[in-house]
Each structure stands twice: as C-alpha cells, then as structure tokens.
Amino acid sequence: GNEFATIICSPNHLEELVLGFLASEGVISKIDELESIQIDDSKGGARVELTHQLGNFFDYSTKRMIASCCGKNREFYFQNDAVIAKTSMTHIELLQNQVLNMMTQLQGASNIFKQTGGLHNAAISDCNDFFEHRQDIGRHNALDKLYGYCIQTVSYTHLRAHETREDL
C-alpha cells in the first residue's frame, strides 16, 4: 500500500479520525467502502484497506488549482477539493444567545483544555444540547473525529457540527 498522510494529533478516537479524514478527503463516502482498518497505537499508525481502487486519485489530490473567486466561484488549493466539495443549501438561523450558550457548554466540557491551556473542541449539536464532543490539538482533527463518529454510528443529516477554538 501507499502512505497517504501523516497527521499530528491527540491520541484518542483514532479510528474516528482516520474515517473522518478519509471521508473529508474524498477517499470514501461511506463505511462500506472499507475492507479493514487497523490502528497501531504503539507505532502511531493506521492501516486501511479499501473495497475499491483509488485510480487516479493521487493525480488530483496533489495537483494545485487556484480559481479566480469572482462571484460565486470558490478557491480550492487542490484540484480534488473542487471535485468533492458540495455547496450546502441548508438554511440555519441561530440566535446570539444560542451560540454563546453552546460555546459556554463546550468550554465547560473541555477538561483537557482546563489542564493544558489550549485545545480545539468540536461538537454535534441540535443548537440547544450537545450529542457528541471531540477534542484534538488540531482543529481539523477534532472535526474529522466527529465526521468519523457520524460515519460509524448515526444518521446525521438533522444534526449540525460546529467548532470553537479555545485560547488563553
């Protein structure tokens, strides 16, 4: 197999991180596309076997693409991002107090942040309560862990994910 990525991360929920990362990169779109996944905590690595070939995926995943960004165009750094990105047509309205309340709840649940002074948190919420919460030293990792959790366990079309960065 080929090495796909090196990720510097917090050492928890690693299978979720791998699943979420592969999905966010467009390698998989559902858990059924995995033949197997093995996490080796002692070596800090993961081995994944897919049910399908990647074909020319690596040609697009590393090719830079810079769009003009005029009007509704969007800038993508890699060509593969343009292939997998989808525009959300969901209309969401949040009240200011909902956002502040969720942020306070999320910060209160972050024991590691309280101990270390810096960490990224992400949560799945219905705009009132949190259903699931992940932490990581990398903000994208925290989101990928939640994405992996969703792929493994829930139908998340009715849920919203959001992130807060906590600093001193």
Where are these regions (language model features)?
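Intrinsically disordered, low-complexity regions enriched in acidic/Ser/Thr/Pro/Gln residues
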Residues: 2-125, 132-133
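Alpha-helix N-cap/helix-start and coil->helix boundary motif
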Residues: 14, 139-140, 166
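Small-side-chain structural scaffolding
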Residues: 18, 46, 122, 142, ...
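Glycine- and Gly-Pro-enriched alpha-helical subdomains that act as flexible
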Residues: 115-118, 123-156
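Conserved small/polar residues in nucleotide/adenosyl-binding loops
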Residues: 157-166
